[in-house]
Amino acid sequence: AHGLPCVICSTGLSAGEEARLEAASEQVPVFRSANMSLGVNVLIELCKQAVTLFGGEFDIEIVEKHHHNKLDAPSGTALMIADAINTRAGGAYEYVYDRHEVRQPRGRQELGISAVRGGGIVGDHDVLFCGPEEGVTLRHRAQSRGVFADGAVQAALFVDGRAPGYYTMSDLLR
């Protein structure tokens, strides 16, 4: 890090790479997020509130959509959303990816994650909370890749001059 604050936005880091970031944060400010969009991170905060308010009585499905050139499925952002929900629920959920091979009723502890790839979709994430008589859908739609650059700039401004430590979008949003 050469004594400079770091802003890291990447998915798929190994445990060793994550450990190196943690170690670097003892010397310099390290800001880490799998998605730099402020809107996605607000969506995550809203999902955590919804999990608390619905108390496990609602089924949860995440549907993410991206352009046809995106390599990973599900996206790192979809997994970030799922992990935030599951952490808030005390690890109660098991992830089920798509359902094309599942031939049984949905289990209460399932958290469904589905991926769609097509055209030039920058990034859409829908989180469905489905109850027996009503449902709530929370959605984020990135209409341009500029939102990720804007978030990265805000993250850089946030860590500039801060003490060494490991910072996330939750810190920036507070």
Where do the protein language model's features map onto the residues?
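Rossmann-fold NAD(P)-binding glycine/threonine-rich loop
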Residues: A1-L4, C9-R32, L38-A50
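C-terminal substrate-binding/catalytic lobe of Rossmann-fold NAD(P)-dependent oxidoreductases
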Residues: G56-R174
